[in-house]
């Protein structure tokens, strides 16, 4: 486990990261932990794997430098990709979606011949038959990505047989981040707690969240954030939930052909109207034969194509080729 320990130790000790790796359980950090779990130690030999950080000091001259970039071009941690000197010191940049790679090539002029796409992955989710007494919605991503709009839409719908479960908190990125940003969303969380048919759970560890997803019907996500992949959507689809979201960022790439995807409207008012229509349609048609047939195919395909059984082979092959 010497090589894996080296990779994790470097991530843990990287003080230039905006959040502590050890304390953070966001999508990128969780993906690195799962990669470490599913690959043999020898795969990481002579590899310097850098997660979401373009700090020059992280380059190691005696190793193959691989930047694993989950961030959109507007994130501070990606900004140094504008430096040709830094990019020249990298051997490879791994992106989590075609959309994200294309944006980086366009914005930073990243050489195509040193960039590759390896999609995110999940551990397979066993299917549990959904309850039929009511429709349960879930929002299980960070609060700034669309929770305010969802809460407004949910209030306007005012449906007695529909419950909204909110699993959202800034603590997901650790104490330092929570201390800095937590107060910003306190009023929104309080609104969740005081809204009819809404249950606020805060941060849920992934194991608990997966068990909750199995009982949910719809991932209600009016995304206002340029997702570069969206693990929350992948896990929801694998658990048999219908995903109702926007086409912002890589969501179309991630959720097609199964998700109910609406065009992202630039004003909140327009987005609320369009999203309300789409969500209501999804609620009303959830138990239809067509929807159930689609969701069965969805969970089978997503569990198959996004499984670490598949992705670990891709990573092993990539590292082997990178060493040649």
Question: What residues fall within each predicted segment?
Answer:
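Nucleotide-activated donor-binding/catalytic signature segment of Leloir-type glycosyltransferases, i.e.
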Residues: 178-204
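Short hydrophobic beta-strand element within catalytic cores of glycosyltransferases
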Residues: 242-245
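Conserved donor-binding/catalytic core segment of Leloir-type glycosyltransferases
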Residues: 129-146, 151-154, 164-165
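N-terminal pre-catalytic "stem/leader" segment of glycosyltransferase-like enzymes
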Residues: 1-54
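A charged, aromatic-enriched C-terminal amphipathic alpha-helix characteristic of glycosyltransferases
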Residues: 25-30, 266, 270-273, 287-323
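Carbohydrate-associated surface elements
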Residues: 99, 121
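Acidic donor-binding loop of glycosyltransferase active sites
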Residues: 214-228
């Amino acid at each position: 486990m010497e090589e894996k320990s080296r990779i994790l130790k470097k991530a843990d000790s990287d003080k230039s990261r905006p959040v502590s790796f050890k304390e953070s359980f966001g999508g990128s950090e969780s993906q690195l932990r799962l990669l470490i779990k599913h690959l043999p130690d020898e795969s990481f030999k002579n590899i310097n794997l850098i997660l979401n950080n373009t700090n020059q000091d992280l380059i190691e001259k005696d190793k193959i430098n691989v930047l694993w970039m989950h961030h959109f071009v507007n994130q501070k941690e990606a900004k140094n990709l504008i430096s040709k000197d830094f990019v020249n010191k990298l051997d490879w940049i791994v992106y989590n979606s075609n959309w994200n790679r294309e944006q980086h090539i366009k914005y930073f002029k990243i050489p195509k011949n040193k960039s590759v796409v390896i999609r995110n992955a999940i551990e397979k989710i066993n299917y549990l038959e959904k309850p039929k007494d009511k429709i349960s919605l879930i929002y299980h991503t960070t609060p700034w990505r669309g929770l305010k709009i969802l809460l407004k839409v949910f209030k306007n719908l005012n449906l007695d047989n529909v419950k909204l479960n909110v699993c959202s908190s800034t603590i997901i990125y650790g104490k330092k981040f929570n201390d800095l940003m937590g107060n910003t969303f306190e009023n929104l969380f309080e609104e969740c707690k005081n809204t009819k048919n809404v249950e606020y759970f805060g941060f849920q560890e992934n194991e608990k969240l997966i068990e909750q997803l199995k009982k949910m019907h719809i991932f209600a996500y009016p995304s206002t954030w340029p997702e570069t992949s969206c693990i929350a959507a992948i896990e929801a689809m694998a658990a048999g939930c219908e995903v109702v979201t926007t086409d912002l960022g890589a969501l179309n790439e991630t959720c097609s052909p199964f998700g109910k995807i609406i065009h992202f409207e630039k004003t909140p008012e327009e987005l609320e109207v369009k999203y309300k229509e789409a969500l209501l349609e999804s609620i009303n048609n959830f138990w239809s034969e067509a929807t159930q047939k689609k969701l069965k195919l969805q969970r089978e395909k997503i569990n198959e194509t996004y499984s670490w059984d598949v992705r670990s082979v891709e990573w092993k092959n990539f590292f082997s080729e990178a060493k040649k």
